[in-house]
A protein has these predicted regions:
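Alpha-helix boundary/capping detector
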Residues: 50, 63, 241-243, 428-431
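Generic structural motif
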Residues: 4, 42, 78-80, 90, ...
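Acidic, S/T/G-rich, low-cysteine, solvent-exposed domains in lumenal/extracellular/periplasmic regions
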Residues: 109, 126-414
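Juxtamembrane extramembrane loops of integral membrane proteins
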Residues: 1-106, 110-179, 183, 391
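A short, polar/proline- and glycine-enriched secondary-structure boundary/capping micro-motif
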Residues: 94-97, 311, 379-380, 428-429
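Short linear loop/turn motifs
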Residues: 65-70, 226-236, 421-423
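Generic, ordered loop/turn and secondary-structure boundary motif
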Residues: 86, 119, 224, 301, ...
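Juxtamembrane amphipathic/hinge helix adjacent to a transmembrane helix
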Residues: 403-431
């Protein structure tokens, strides 16, 4: 729906409307009759205006008389599922194709993949009116819930029936039985994403460090559980300093907060393709445990060689870190993808299952990150209000990285490039 006459004197809206309409027409042409378009121009106090308001499309006031421009979308499928764009924001033109493709994909997908979320931190999104995003600390999970079903699991779970993708988040106090269940799920072909962290910096969380020692050995991962300092990728923070009653801004290096960029993000791996900045918070270090393993180890993002590792208790004073920084020349990985044949590290476990697997039944598919903080809003998202709707402004690619992982692991990888590259004009390929 679009108020064409009222927007004639608003070039930015008019131009973007032409772009949106052109893209919708292109989608319809490619769909061979499976997408039907109806363009509505709501008049004040009309049935059309009541209809669009009922589904959340909002008018944008343009004068003191209360005239409103409508510029939104209501999409539905044959089972009456509804997706709505309250108002097309011209400042988001670079991601229009991704926005529309997400809607088409969601309405066309018969069943959402089930995400099993095994977390030692409260990541459950709050229940908000009108599905408002951005009220919790893990907005990325709120976003992903539009495309995936989530089951938040108890930390003492011992089986993962019906789970398409298992997330293990900051396992700070995992039992042997649960860790064994995670390993056997992976060896049996289950897909998993693991977040471990040497120093989880959330103030109200008592268990600061996490590990998954036995599973990581199964995955042929050597995990340095010290905090990795990176002198070449340190975050630069602006701080205020008072000197004789004059306040000045000073730049301070936060060595334990790497900003991973450029050559340190693997563009050849589809999860990292197109990403330009990942902000990490006191990460650990990953490397292969045994070079003779049958597991394929692919870095997603890495440190420089200007690094030093320190125990968690020694990284609280940023000035002290700078003064005592002595690079070792060792490079670490912060995120890796693993595939191939894995062998159990629980063959002598007292509580083995009757159908215990000593070797994986097929190639494993696992992603491991050595930081858990980076998916929290504070390190990638700024929440703003637009027409009474919370809008997420990304300040780094952390959210895209997490979404890429989910999409790649569950078969939605055809659309990863739409998220990572702001290119409104590109050749179209029909995805079967």
């Amino acid at each position: 729906m679009y108020s064409r006459d009222l927007s004639k004197n608003i070039p930015i809206i008019q131009n973007y409307a032409n772009q949106v309409q052109g893209l919708l027409n292109r989608y319809s042409d490619l769909a061979s009759g499976k997408i039907e378009l109806n363009f509505i121009e709501p008049e004040p106090y009309s049935d059309d205006e009541d209809y669009v308001n009922r589904y959340g499309v909002q008018g944008f006031p343009i004068d003191q008389e209360g005239s409103k421009v409508y510029f939104g979308l209501i999409a539905s499928n044959t089972t009456d599922d509804i997706e709505t764009v309250p108002f097309f924001d011209p400042s988001k033109a670079g991601t229009l194709e991704k926005q529309l493709t997400d809607i088409v994909y969601k309405l066309n997908r018969s069943k959402k993949p089930m995400i099993g979320f095994l977390s030692w931190v409260d990541t459950t999104p709050p229940m908000m009116p009108n599905n408002q995003l951005g009220q919790g600390e893990y907005t990325i999970l709120e976003e992903l819930s539009y495309f995936y079903d989530f089951e938040f699991l108890d930390t003492d779970v011992e089986s993962f029936e019906g789970i398409d993708l298992l997330i293990v988040y900051h396992p700070s106090d995992i039992s042997d039985k649960t860790e064994y269940a995670v390993e056997q799920f992976i060896l049996n072909g289950g897909k998993s994403v693991i977040f471990v962290d040497p120093f989880f910096e959330k103030n109200d969380h008592s268990n600061k460090s996490s590990n998954l020692e036995n599973v990581l050995k199964t995955l042929n991962i050597n995990y340095n559980s010290n905090v990795i300092l990176d002198g070449a990728q340190a975050t630069r923070l602006q701080t205020q300093q008072n000197i004789t009653d004059n306040t000045s801004l000073q730049t301070m290096l936060k060595l334990n907060w790497p900003e991973v960029r450029g050559q340190f993000i693997n563009q050849a791996e589809e999860i990292g393709d197109g990403l330009s900045l990942i902000r990490l918070v006191s990460p650990g270090g990953l490397s292969p445990l045994n070079d003779e393993s049958e597991i394929s180890y692919t870095p997603i993002m890495s440190s420089s060689e200007v690094t030093m590792d320190l125990p968690m208790k020694e990284v609280h004073d940023p000035i002290k870190l700078i003064n005592n920084f002595q690079p070792t020349g060792i490079s670490y990985d912060f995120g890796v993808r693993l595939s191939g044949i894995a062998k159990s590290n629980f063959n002598d476990f007292e509580f083995k299952n009757d159908n215990h697997l000593e070797i994986s039944s097929k190639n494993i598919n696992v992603v491991v990150f050595s930081d858990a903080d980076f998916i929290r809003n504070a390190f990638w998202a700024r929440i703003q209000k637009f027409l009474d709707t919370n809008v997420i402004e990304a300040t780094s690619d952390n959210g895209s990285l997490v979404t890429n992982v989910f999409d790649s692991m569950t078969g939605y990888d055809e659309f990863i490039d739409l998220r990572n590259k702001e290119a409104p004009f590109r050749p179209f390929v029909v995805v079967q």
